[in-house]
Amino acid sequence: MNIFADFDARIKKTFQDIDLKPKDGGELDLSRIGVEPPRDASHGDIATNAAMVLSKAVGQNPRELAARIAEALKADEDVESVDVAGPGFINLRLKASYWQRELLVMLNEGTDFGRSRLGAGKKVNVEYVSANPTGPMHVGHCRGAVVGDVLANLLKFAGYDVVKEYYINDAGAQIDVLARSVMLRYREALGESIGEIPAGLYPGDYLVRVGQELAGEFGTKLLEMPEAEALAIVKDRTIDAMMAMIRADLDALNVHHDVFYSERKLHVDHARAIRNAINDLTLKGHVYKGKLPPPKGRLPEDWEDREQTLFRSTEVGDDIDRPLMKSDGSFTYFAGDVTYFKDKYDRGFNEMIYVLGADHGGYVKRLEAVARAVSDGKAKLTVLLCQLVKLFRNGEPVRMSKRAGEFITLRDVVDEVGRDPVRFMMLYRKNDAPLDFDFAKVTEQSKDNPVFYVQYASARCHSVFRQAADQLGLVDLDRVAMGSHFEKLTDESEIALVRKLAEYPRLIESAAIHQEPHRLAFYLYDLASSFHSQWNRGAENPDLRFIKVNDPDLSLARLGLVQVVSDVLTSGLTIIGADAPTEMR
């Protein structure tokens, strides 16, 4: 249960109890009322700005109104005390019995604690990675892969119907270049000397194997075919090989998509899908024949002052109208974007999320314009931009050679430090802030390494369970037994840990609403810190140890608390896509 939603309802009920009404009649606007943890934990358990938000509407001084609301809240059986602070903040401190009951709810829900129905009935498409199938994934793809994957997991946990999607850019000019590059490697595999790879082709050694496989399958037959026919075969085989490599890289990172959508699908049957999408926009009045003003600055060599088929995107929020067709009659890449969005919308998605690199910032307004035009404003579109990742080793930048074909791959990073450190650390900054990734720091065993610190807390929980087996003979811990004596948890440090656990449902919902999966990583670090602190208190004070051999009921209660910590760590790490270890190796 979200305790803040619970007390939001209780606080609003007091408005009826004190007959709180707007001075000018009508209904109170309660939308700006916030109920949240106080910024300073010493101020209490729950804080609200209700009096300050409502004072003008009811015609009363904020502090006086706060005092009225506070007096009504004192009648709540779960409230220990209520204070008015500053200009009219109301701070509530709750009784230990309330936290003990909440802990029992958490224990009974297990790893489902925090699961929400926030997104019930809402279908969301999260598109991420969508790297061009022209080579292995490099480290630059890594952040978007993790952000998109964890966001999708988070939304699922919050009750949304989520589809993870990868858009395969397999219809552009870069694929033609790729096919010619592989054709060269195919000839090389047949024994021909190809010399230096010509400028403009893909030079990577990863294409050598594709050429060898083609030589093994076709022998010299491709050389005997018309070039266009041979290149079509090479293109198909190469895309399959590149996507197999990309899927393997993603699998190593524990990233798994539900749908792989080929751009070529939009172009079948003479691009019928694109033509239909443009026809729909035309019927809505969003397409016209016209000329675009010349671009600012020096004109490109291929600039043509000509009449074009244009999307009237400035009327739906874009900076300029966008061409839908090229001078040769083929469709622009943007026309494909329009069609792909329409396809998603026709599949029943209420919301589409695009996770893109920061270099795609110029796409945001045009995609938002497409969403408004195609769905008549009914669908929500969000673009999350991921800033660059800078690689370091022991504080020194990792130098990547600019020589063509050499770069650090995603697989290089995962193989060196492991999947979990990569996933966790890619979330340890908000996606729109640059991120430094130090190979040494993410593998050190210290508090300064967030993923180690969180996973170590999980392992410590299980070490407590093993101690319970050794010292109390409790091999199979029973949740009913553990929850039967929570009234014994009265130490302030124990209650503080319960408070931190109680924040989890609110954290899940707020991270889902704001589409900020990094909040989960921060919360898990804070929870781990609280648990480690409680462990250390037990090391310093025998009365606070989790296992008290001479007090089995208290031991069971504390084991129940540890179990809930373990459940929440497991839940959060699962959403992140990392393991919750039972011991550290």
From Swiss-Prot:
Single annotated GO MF: ATP binding
Pfam families: Arg_tRNA_synt_N, DALR_1, tRNA-synt_1d
SMART domains membership: Arg_tRNA_synt_N, DALR_1
EC identifiers of the protein: 6.1.1.19
Enzyme class: ligase
Catalytic activity: tRNA(Arg) + L-arginine + ATP = L-arginyl-tRNA(Arg) + AMP + diphosphate
Gene3D superfamilies documented for this protein: Arginyl tRNA synthetase N-terminal domain (3.30.1360.70), HUPs (3.40.50.620), Isoleucyl-tRNA Synthetase, Domain 1 (1.10.730.10)
Compartments in which it is found: Cytoplasm
Example GO BP: arginyl-tRNA aminoacylation
Keywords for the protein's UniProt record, in alphabetical order: Aminoacyl-tRNA synthetase, ATP-binding, Cytoplasm, Ligase, Nucleotide-binding, Protein biosynthesis
Motif 'HIGH' region location, chain numbering: 131-141
Cellular component terms per the entry's GO annotation: cytoplasm
Assembly and oligomerization: Monomer.
Sequence similarity: Belongs to the class-I aminoacyl-tRNA synthetase family.
Designated name of the protein: Arginine--tRNA ligase
Origin species: Brucella abortus (strain 2308)
Lineage, highest ranks first: Bacteria, Pseudomonadati, Pseudomonadota, Alphaproteobacteria, Hyphomicrobiales
